[in-house]
Regions:
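Hydrophobic alpha-helical segments, especially transmembrane helices
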Residues: 22, 45-47, 59
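Conserved short strand/loop->alpha-helix "switch" segment adjacent to the catalytic nucleotide/phosphoryl-transfer site
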Residues: 28-50, 103-105
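Conserved beta-strand-loop-beta-strand hairpin that lines the nucleotide-binding pocket
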Residues: 1-8, 12, 57-143
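Acidic-residue sensor for enzyme active/binding pockets
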Residues: 21, 51, 83
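Helix-loop-beta hinge of the Bergerat
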Residues: 3-39
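Short, structured helix-loop boundary elements
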Residues: 17, 38-42, 46, 66, ...
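Hydrophobic residues in the alpha-helical elements that line and stabilize the ATP-binding pocket
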Residues: 52, 56
Length: 143
């Protein structure tokens, strides 16, 4: 049984996105090795991580660039849980309305993208003064 837990704390700066992506994908490759279809899964995970991390920078920490972003990864066998912790005011998910295609709006697709690409998406407001976005998925074995 494979089990790993790791975390990374980075500044609220989009220039750190590639560092966070490399940390995530490298950690998963070290733990899961050749059993996963990396070209397909890395694109999926990169997109979800970019969406979640950039939302923290642009929204939660918009006026507070000195606050850190904490990213946690739990891996058990091929099940992954990725948590992104922020210090923002939070977002009431009850008020979220997915964008309608005919509306042609430019933003608001992040939650939709993340929930389509991951098996489970959960958001918790104000745990010890922080918010946590949890993204979970089972990575399929390489065919």
């Amino acid at each position: 049984m494979n089990y790993m837990k790791t975390e990374l704390q980075v500044p609220s700066d989009l220039r750190f996105l590639s560092i966070v992506e490399n940390w995530l994908l490298s950690s998963l490759e070290v733990e899961l090795g050749e059993h996963i279809d990396w070209p397909r899964q890395s694109n999926r995970l990169r997109l979800v991580l970019a969406e979640a991390y950039s939302n923290v920078i642009r929204h939660a920490h918009r006026d507070k660039p000195n606050l850190p972003v904490l990213v946690r990864l739990d891996v058990e066998n091929r099940d992954i849980a990725l948590e992104i912790w922020d210090h923002g005011n939070g977002y009431e998910m009850d008020t979220y309305n997915p964008p309608q295609p005919e509306a042609k709006q430019e933003s608001g697709y992040g939650w939709l993208i993340m929930s389509r690409l991951m098996d489970r998406v959960d958001y918790k407001l104000q745990i010890d003064g922080r918010n946590c976005l949890k993204l979970e998925a089972s990575l399929p074995e390489k065919a």
